[in-house]
Amino acid sequence: MNASSKRKIISQSEISKKIAVMNEEMQGFWANNSWDIRKCPHPSAIELSKNPALRNRWVRFERVKNLWLRTELKYFYFYHLNNGIWNAKTVWIRKGTVINKMLDFLDLKYPSITSITEVPIEKAMTEYRTYLTKRGVRITTTNYKITANQEKTPVKANSYYVTNLKQFMEFYENFYFDGEEWDKDVWDRRNLPLPDDKVNPTQYEYTINFKGFRNTYFKQLVKRYCKLRLNVDSFSYVSDIAQRLKEFFNFLDMKFKQVQRVHQLTRVEIEAYLSELNMMGIKPSTITGRISILEGLFSTLLRLEWDDVPSKILIYSEDYPKIPRAKPRFIDEFVLEQLNSHLDKLPEYIATMTMIVQECGMRISELCTLKKGCLLEDKDGDFFLKYYQWKMKKEHIVPISKEVALLIKVREDKVSEEFPDSEYLFPRKDGSPLKQETFRGELNKLAYEQNIVDKSGEIYRFHAHAFRHTVGTRMINNGMPQHIVQKFLGHESPEMTSRYAHIFDETLKNEFTKFQEKLVTNNGDVLDLDEDNEVDDVELQWFKKNINAQVLPNGYCRLPVVAGGCPHANACLDCTHFCTSKQFLPQHEEQLERTEELLAIAKDKQWQRQVETNSRVKERLEQIIGSLTG
C-alpha cells in the first residue's frame, strides 16, 4: 500500500488529470519554466520589479527535471499568487531566496515520482533537514516574543528553507484530498460554508484540529459533535470544544484503557478527571468551562438518541466549583498616563485605535472591524460612532468627542487612498480587518521598550478588554447611573454591568466633574440606533445633553446632580435679593418649559436626585410666573 492511499489521497489517475488541468490554467507567462519578475503580469510583480535594489529576478523551475513535480511546484506558486494569498514579494524575495535549495533537493531525491504526495511529509522533512545541515544551511531561526510576564524570550522556529517545503507538501495533501472538508482531521474554516456570524475575522484561528486523539472511535464521535455545534456556536468556540474533549478522551485512554465507548463511562472515571482538573492549578472559571463542555456532549448524546449514550447521569451541579465574583481588570490611571505619553512611538493606526478604545470602551473585535463611514454627525455638529457588536450580533452607536472624530476622519482619508477596495478603517494588506493579536502585540511591545510599569514597578501587560473595563469602572465610580453605563457599553443585561459597580476612596468631586464634562457634555451619552439611523432623534439628543443636568436660564449646569446638589444652580431663584418684572416673563416661561421637560425625563427614568432638584426649581418658577401674571 503506498503512502497516498493511507492518507486518503485521490488515485494516481485522478492526480494525473488534475496535473493536466494545472498545465491548462498556467498559460502565457506562467507556462514558462523560468519566471522573470520583469515580465510577470501580476500587479504586485510589476510594482516590485521597479525596485532598483531587487536582487532576485528569476525563479528557475527548470532545475527540477521531473516534469510532474515541476508542474506541481509551478502551480503551487501560481495558485497562491493569483488567489491573493501571496504577493510577488513573498514569491521572489521571501521564498525566492530559499527556493533553489528545495528545487535541487527534490530533483536529487525524487527524480521518478509522479506526485509529491507519494512521499510522506514526515519522511521528506527529515531528509530535507539532513540535506540542508550537510550543506551548512540553517534549519531553524530564532525569533523573539514578549511573554505573558512581559519578558523578551527567544523562540526557535523552522527556517524559511524548511517551511517552504512543508507548505508545498501540505498544499497538495489538501489539494488531492479524497473527500469533504468534514472528513479531514483538520478543518479549515476558509474551506467550509460557514455564515459570517460564525467567524470572527479579527482572529487568527483558521482551523479545528482533531489530530492527536489516542482513540479513533472517540475522535470520530467528537468530529460529529463539533459539526453539529457549528450550527449554533462560533468557530472559535467549537475549536475550544474539540481541544477540551480531546484532553478528556486522551486522559481516559491513558488512565482507563478499558473504556472504549461512552456508555461504559461511570462516575469513577468522571471523578478521576475532576481531580485531574483541580490539580492542574487552573482557575475555577476554566474548570467550569471544561466540565460544561463535557456535560454538553453527554446531554446532546442523550437528547438526540445517538447510538452510544451515557448509561446514567455522570455530571452533577455540585461538580462545578464556586466561581468568585469577577472584578473588572481596569487599567490604572498611573499606567494610562505612561501609555498616552508614548502614543507617538506607536504605528499611526495603532495609536488611533488606542485613542478610540480609551474613549468608547468597545470590545477588541469591534475596534478591529470599524468600517469606513462609521462616523455619524447630528444637526449640532456632534459626532457618534457606529459599529457592529460581534458578541451581541447587532449594531451599536455611542457619542464620541470631536477630537477622536477628527482622528477617525484623518484615518479614513488615508485608508481610502491606500486601500480603496477595503471596507475597513484598519485593514491588513489584503484588505481584511486587522487581527486582534496585532493590536495587543504592539501595545505590549511598547510597554517593554518604553518601560511602562505599574505602581509596583513591574512592566505592565496590556489586555485589550481591560480598556473596556476601565471605561465601565470609571463611569460607575464617578456616579454614572448603572443603566446608562449598560447602554454605553452595549451590555445585554444589568448583570454584565454590575461587575463594575465598586467605588474607590480616592474618587474626588473635581475628577468626577472632569469625567462627566468629557463624557456627558462634550461626548454626550449612549444612544441606541433607531430604525432610520437618525442621530437627531429627540430622545437621543436628550440623552446626549441632559442626563444628570440642571436647567439654567441660559443653558444647563455641567455639574451632575448625582455628585450632590450644586449650591450655585439657579441660586437667584432662592436669593432674597432677587427681583424680576413682566419684561422677563418670556425667559421665566421658557425656563419653566425646559425644566418640566427635564423633570418628565427624570421621573420616567426614576432619577430621584434630578427629580428633587428640578421640582424645587419648577415650584419657584411657578410662584414667580403666578405673581407676574396674577
From Swiss-Prot:
Keywords: DNA integration, DNA recombination, DNA-binding, Transposable element. This is Transposase B from transposon Tn554. It holds the Pfam family Phage_integrase. Residues 326-513 form the Tyr recombinase domain. GO terms for biological process: DNA integration; DNA recombination. It comes from the Bacteria. Belongs to the 'phage' integrase family. The keyword DNA-binding applies. One of three proteins encoded by transposon Tn554 required for its transposition. GO terms for molecular function: DNA binding. Residues 216-302 form the Core-binding (CB) domain. The active site is at 363, 391, 465, 468, 491, 500 (o-(3'-phospho-dna)-tyrosine intermediate). Transmembrane segments: none annotated.
